[in-house]
């Protein structure tokens, strides 16, 4: 599979692919890191979980959250996403 990204977005949010989660958790994570994406979130509605990956220079960081959390977007100073709004 060849991917071409015309520009490097700062932040990408993906909904996990139920049929092929490895694609989101491994392949896309590495692809986006190599492309210069600074923050990548993987949202899994079935597990009500959010994995936050962010890249700072040579460091790679990962955080696990649930839909009960208000999650800070690490690359922006004052931006939070409240996932509790999505729970039935």
Predicted regions and their residues:
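C-terminal interaction segment
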Residues: 1-35, 42-88
